[in-house]
Structures are given as structure tokens and as C-alpha cells.
Amino acid sequence: MMTVAQMRVRIALTALVALILTVLPLPMWLDVLRPAFLVLTVLYWSINTPRAGGIGLGFLCGLLLDVFQGPVLGEHALALSIVAYIAVREHQRIRSKPAFQQSLLVFAALAFYEFVVFAIDGWTGHPVTSPLRWLHCLTGAIVWPPAAAILSYSEGRLA
């Protein structure tokens, strides 16, 4: 059994790796297909350890993402907090689903996240990027089963 301190260290390390994977510069053609690793990580911890992960983790990770790449401070923090809240609220239902159905729910969560960021960008007068920004939802849903397996391995249990 893992202590709370050990769990928080693992959550922080996986969130840091996800943040690095999210802000790592890639060629444009590959950047369009990059899954939202940070959102997937926050979703995983919010679903599997709602007390250790969750809204606070979503807010902190979103704030760090805003510092690195957000045009408006707080937009990713708000979007990740809302997605984490929904994941914590529905964590028992989501955990009981098979991987394919979880991927569909993750697709919906990623689409909601992108919509919130899209809406904030529009309200603040920042130019709306191309429709290719929605590909993150599809690639995130495809990557969810292996990502969840890797994160569950880091948690010390098998998927």
C-alpha cells in the first residue's frame, strides 16, 4: 500500500512528464496529431484517485500550461478544472466501463476541454486556430488505453 506522500509524488512526476510532452516543440504536421497528454493525465488521476488527483491537480496543471503556452492566463486552468470536476464526480461510472467505452468518454471530455478553450479564445479576441485543433480529441481517445495502462503501472498496479 502506498502512502499519501508517495502517491502525490507519483502524481506530480507523471503530471510533469505530461506537461513536458505537451509543450515539447514538434513539427507542425506532427503537432496537429499530438494528444493532449496533460489532459489525459489529469483525467486518469481524477478517475482513479479522485482524492489525490482532481480539481486541484487540474487547476495547477492548467495554470502551468497557461504559463508555458496560453495566451490568456487561466484558460487551461479553468478548462482542466471543469473536466477534472466531471471526472471526479463520475469516476465510479467511468472506471466500471471497458477500455473502448472509456475511450469514448475520454473523447467527450477532450472535446469539452477543447470547446472551453475555444470559447475563451473567442471571448478574449484571440484568433481562432484551424479546425485541426479538434484532432487532439481523436488522438487522445485512441491513446487513452495505452496511456491508462502506463499510468496504472506507474501507480503500482496492473491495468
Listing of model-derived features with the role each one plays in the protein:
Residues 1-159:
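Terminal, non-globular segments
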